[in-house]
Curated annotation (Swiss-Prot):
Gene3D superfamilies with a match to the protein in the record: 1.10.1760.20
Any Pfam family matching the protein: CbiM
Pathway this chain belongs to: Cofactor biosynthesis; adenosylcobalamin biosynthesis
Keywords: Cell membrane, Cobalamin biosynthesis, Cobalt, Cobalt transport, Ion transport, Membrane, Transmembrane, Transmembrane helix, Transport
Protein name per its UniProtKB record: Putative cobalt transport protein CbiM
Source species of the chain: Halobacterium salinarum (strain ATCC 29341 / DSM 671 / R1)
PANTHER family: COBALT TRANSPORT PROTEIN CBIM, PTHR43627
Keyword Methyltransferase: no
Length: 220
C-alpha cells in the first residue's frame, strides 16, 4: 500500500500530512512514557517495530503507484494500542522511503494514515471487542487481519479521491471500487497469513510474560 514518491497531487499529500502529524506526535509521547515506565516495554516496542518493518518490506507490485504487502501492525496494536502503532509505523515508513525506495517522502502522510492510523484503529477496536470472549491468539489474529484489510481500503480511498474515474461523487466511488478490487486479489490472502503470523508471535510473547494477558484483559 506504500504510495510511491510524487504520485499524489500536492493538495492531497498535504491533507494526509495534516491528519497524520498530530497522531504521530501523540504516539511519540505515549511510546516514550511506556518505555520509561517499564524496561520490558522497551524490548516489546522493539519487537513490534521490527515486525512492522519486516512484513511491510515484503512488497508485491499492485495498483499503479502502490504495492501489496503485509502491514505488520497487529502486534503493536494489541500490545500498545493505535497511538504507539502510528508512531512506530511512521518511523518504519520514513526509513523505508529514505533507504529502501519504498513509498516516498511526499506520500509519507498518506501512507502513515492508512497503515499507521486508520488500519490500527480498526484492528484495535476488533481486538477490544473480541478479547473478553476469545483467547489472546484468536483475538490477535482477527485484529491483525482487520488492520491489514482496512489499511488497503483506506489506500483505495486515498487513490480514488485523488484520481477519480469521472466527474462528481460517482467518479470517486467508481475509482475507489476499482482500486479496492485490484488490491483484494492479493490482500485477502496476505491479510490472513499476516494474522496467523501475528497470532503465533503474540502467543510466544505471552508465554515469556504471563502478566501480559492480565494487562490486555484476556484470560486464555
Amino acid at each position: 500500500m506504500h504510495i510511491m514518491e510524487g504520485f499524489l497531487p500536492g493538495i492531497w499529500a498535504l491533507v494526509w500530512f495534516v491528519v497524520a502529524i498530530p497522531v504521530i506526535s501523540y504516539g511519540a509521547l505515549k511510546t516514550a512514557r511506556l518505555a520509561r515506565n517499564d524496561e520490558l516495554n522497551k524490548s516489546h516496542i522493539a519487537v513490534a517495530a521490527a515486525f512492522i518493518f519486516v512484513l511491510s518490506a515484503l512488497k508485491i507490485p499492485s495498483v499503479t503507484g502502490s504495492t501489496s504487502h503485509p502491514t505488520g501492525t497487529g502486534i503493536a496494536v494489541v500490545l500498545f494500542g493505535p497511538a504507539v502503532t502510528a508512531f512506530l509505523s511512521a518511523i518504519v515508513l520514513l526509513y523505508q522511503a529514505l533507504l529502501l525506495g519504498h513509498g516516498g517522502l511526499t506520500t509519507l502522510g498518506a501512507n502513515v494514515v492508512s497503515m499507521g492510523v486508520v488500519g490500527p484503529v480498526a484492528g484495535w477496536v476488533v481486538f477490544r471487542a473480541l478479547n473478553p470472549y476469545l483467547d489472546l491468539q484468536k483475538a490477535t489474529f482477527a485484529a491483525a487481519v482487520i488492520a491489514d484489510w482496512t489499511t488497503y481500503l483506506v489506500t483505495s480511498i486515498q487513490l480514488g479521491v485523488a484520481f477519480p474515474s469521472g466527474p462528481g461523487v460517482a467518479g470517486v466511488v467508481d475509482s475507489i471500487v476499482r482500486f479496492a478490487s485490484v488490491f483484494s486479489i492479493t490482500q485477502i490472502p496476505i491479510g490472513i497469513v499476516e494474522g496467523a503470523l501475528a497470532a503465533g508471535l503474540i502467543g510466544y510473547i505471552a508465554m515469556s510474560r504471563q502478566s501480559i494477558k492480565t494487562r490486555l484483559g484476556v484470560t486464555a
